[in-house]
């Protein structure tokens, strides 16, 4: 689970609830540049206050046994990408955080929207690579601008891991490439149809417990990418709650996926 905030006590209490709810890791968001988040004085703006971030990490680690990580940028605004980023990582890692997921862009807190902040600031992968050289005992995971699973291979020569976001969400089927490309395991023979059929019991369980079925199925829409009936499939998933027999409709959709 990812938490956002700047109050060490409240974050510690939130971590307790998260652990009790079954989450296996706490990630602290120090990367979001949205105006709302800035006004709450958390997210990316906290990169300017590494001491407070360190206090938050200490509080969380004192309250839970599950791992704690930080997601951040390489800097914000006029921060020095070399000196200031190193100082931030040093301060926060000394408080007990050993895993950092680093979006290889600065965040500009004024003048750019959150969407623009995901694309306009230039990527600086080399800076993230150097972080791993500076802090070899930390786990450094690179993020930002990664469009294909194949992109991961070159980064993994320099860092410990890769995080992909929007591109995997929009086309989740490409995750089947991870095992053969990264781990040298046999390629999965699962089709998109197989995957959706496997998800039907979960969807119906959520539906029976009162969840809005269309919100659950919203996250399957990426399976339609590149298929012949993509528009039809996405429309059916969005309207699944209007069908009398949603389970039967899901089977029909799965058959359209092929």
Would you name each region that the model predicts?
Residues 2-258:
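Flavin-dependent oxidoreductase catalytic cores
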